[in-house]
Amino acid sequence: MEKKLFLVDVGEEISTRILIPENPLCMYVFAHGAGAGIDHDFIITVQKTLFKKGIATFTFNFVYKEKGKKLPTSKKLVDEEYKAVWKYVLKEFNNYSLFAGGKSMGGRVSTRVIDDLSEIKGLIFLGFPIHSPGRPDKFVGAYIKNIRTPMLFLQGSKDPLSYKEITEKIVAELHNAQLYWLEGGKHSWETTKKNPKNQMQLINEACDQIVAFCKCYYKG
């Protein structure tokens, strides 16, 4: 189901897409990455795959993307929008166990506003940007070391924003985090023709990990 949602707290209208299977295990609220909105094939495919596996999803456009802009102009704005969406979800879907997160930037935003995501069971990242592209020395988000909410990092092994050595070191230092490598996948888990698995297979593999993670924490 696609619908427009007016965010009272920010005074803007955004597009959302909600997929709810019969008797879902939980609901995963996730935001898109910086460069592409909820109509991107990656977001749509993840939603449809999770639907088939029994997990409800709620995804949404940030306002800048809704207005056709390429990139966000302010961290504060996207943070406030994520919090406003969560407030709406808590009101309308309070019968579900709720998980949050997102693709790349969307996942990072969820970590910045974690203190405002009440009733959250866990964070799920679809390719978390651990460092600047090709710059493992430029770690972004040291604050995530303070998060105690369970976290699942789903990272492509060929992601230029998530080199293996630094990613494994950082995740190992977190309070309650799991790391799963999608072998051969780049930032959106796309692969080369030589890779044993294609992007669709890696998305399916990642969604299996999401289901397993949610089963561990949806009652917590």
Predicted stretch roles:
Residues 34, 157-159, 184-186:
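Acidic beta-to-alpha connecting loop that harbors the catalytic carboxylate
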Residues 147-148, 153-155, 159:
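Short beta-strand/loop motif that positions the catalytic acidic residue
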Residues 5-97, 189-196:
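Serine-hydrolase catalytic machinery in alpha/beta-hydrolase-like enzymes
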Residues 82-146:
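Primarily recognizes the serine-hydrolase "nucleophile elbow" in alpha/beta-hydrolase
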